[in-house]
């Protein structure tokens, strides 16, 4: 009798309806929720998703505007910018279409693969896109990922970073962008399937398949391995845009081998590829080349948009140093300005810096380290001396002389000199 009385006393903890007044009453730890409250919560979540999506899609610039903003930060790579601008614009328009409920034509998600040498701007392009669109963005290094159950990061940790970037707003996170760098490092060790497990290569590719295609993933909010008893957050990856990038060192040889093989015969020009640089060779990239490199066909299939980035020449590196809104030299000039000092760099010095970066094959990424090394002693001194003008010449870059320091107080005019001297028009 006591049990029967208890059953009759059960009520929903949210709306206070009794058990016999609702269809279902679901029990939790010391609480109950009825089916009507569950439906109401579901409607609230759907409405929040619509609002979050509307905020994103209503502010999407056109492909031309996206490309224009990319030009302010990224030098060169015009074709890659155009492809990315169109792909991102179409991706978020697709979300708007899906949310509208008009499903006459099913629009599939188009993830992106960026292939280009180190320091060519792959990461910067992805970061700038996220900034333009004002959506949650996170980066992951594919080299740290391993198959579940092995030492290393699980692929779900990538989704956790996106959740953190969105301040655990699930609706926003589900419309975010994930950039996976060094994806060429998870290529399988040989073209033929291996009997032994390849936990950091093919195993990672297999683990990434589902989240890239679209699935409801269980994300551990405190990290997967240190807190196994935690509750999981359910995150739908169907509308998350994945951008993968990698240098793919050696793929040019695979392309050259294929193109030379296809041109065997009396009319074949055997020297044609010797005259091409890597950027021109990469433009002939086919899916079979990626397969030979070590990406499995299923993984390639999740990346329908493939674009290649050009190698940066000396002029491009000089432009990167001086022209963009966040140009490296402008950043150092601002740091000197905060110490009541000025920084002037001769054009010949810029040329030498660019040549050094080219020799190291580090692309734009190596420019900052070269400048940091050149300016270290000057930054150490001007913080104490104040009112100093530091001039960097070609001889300074080559290590023949120290940076030239002159007092601004002793000069007749305190009018600031240009950040860079003697730049040709």
Swiss-Prot record:
GO molecular function annotation: ATP binding; ATP hydrolysis activity; ATP-dependent protein folding chaperone; protein dimerization activity; unfolded protein binding; zinc ion binding
Entry's Gene Ontology BP terms: cell division; proteolysis involved in protein catabolic process
Binding site for ATP: 117-124
Family: Belongs to the ClpX chaperone family.
UniProt cross-references to HAMAP family, sorted A to Z: ClpX
Protein task: ATP-dependent specificity component of the Clp protease. It directs the protease to specific substrates. Can perform chaperone functions in the absence of ClpP.
Protein name per the record: ATP-dependent Clp protease ATP-binding subunit ClpX
Biological source species: Rickettsia africae (strain ESF-5)
């Amino acid at each position: 009798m006591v049990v029967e009385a208890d059953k009759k006393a059960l009520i929903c903890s949210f709306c206070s309806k009794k058990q016999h007044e609702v269809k279902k009453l679901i029990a939790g730890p010391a609480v109950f929720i009825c089916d009507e409250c569950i439906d109401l919560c579901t409607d609230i979540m759907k409405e929040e998703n619509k609002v979050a999506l509307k905020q994103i899609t209503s502010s999407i610039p056109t492909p031309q505007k996206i490309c224009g903003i990319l030009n302010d930060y990224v030098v060169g790579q015009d074709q890659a910018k155009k492809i990315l601008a169109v792909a991102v614009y179409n991706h978020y328009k697709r979300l708007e279409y899906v949310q509208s409920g008009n499903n006459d034509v099913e629009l599939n998600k188009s993830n992106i693969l960026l292939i280009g040498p180190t320091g060519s701007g792959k990461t910067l392009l992805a970061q700038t896109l996220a900034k333009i669109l004002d959506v949650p963005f996170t980066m992951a290094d594919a080299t740290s990922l391993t198959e579940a159950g092995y030492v290393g990061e699980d692929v779900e940790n990538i989704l956790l970073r996106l959740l953190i970037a969105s301040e655990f707003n699930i609706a926003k996170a589900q419309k975010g962008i994930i950039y996976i760098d060094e994806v060429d490092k998870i290529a399988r060790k040989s073209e033929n399937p291996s009997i032994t497990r390849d936990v950091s290569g093919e195993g990672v590719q297999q683990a990434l398949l589902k989240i890239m295609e679209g699935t409801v993933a269980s994300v551990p909010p405190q990290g997967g391995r240190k807190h196994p008893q935690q509750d999981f957050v359910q995150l739908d990856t169907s509308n998350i845009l994945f951008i993968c990038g990698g240098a793919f060192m050696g793929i040019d040889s695979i392309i050259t081998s294929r193109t030379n093989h296809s041109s065997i015969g009396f009319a074949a020009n055997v020297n044609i590829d010797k005259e091409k640089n890597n950027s021109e060779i990469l433009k002939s990239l086919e899916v079979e080349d990626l397969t030979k490199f070590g990406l499995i066909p299923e993984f390639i299939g999740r990346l329908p948009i493939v674009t290649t980035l050009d190698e940066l020449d000396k002029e491009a590196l000089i432009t990167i140093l001086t022209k963009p809104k966040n140009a490296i030299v402008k950043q150092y000039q601002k740091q000197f300005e905060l110490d009541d000092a000025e920084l002037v760099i001769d054009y010949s010095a810029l040329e030498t810096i660019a040549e050094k970066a080219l020799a190291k094959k580090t692309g734009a990424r190596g420019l900052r380290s070269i400048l940091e090394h050149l300016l270290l002693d000057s930054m150490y001194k001007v913080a104490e001396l104040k009112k100093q003008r530091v001039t960097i010449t070609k001889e300074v870059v080559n290590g023949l002389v120290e940076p030239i320091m002159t007092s601004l107080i002793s000069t007749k005019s305190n009018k600031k000199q240009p950040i860079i001297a003697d730049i040709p028009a």
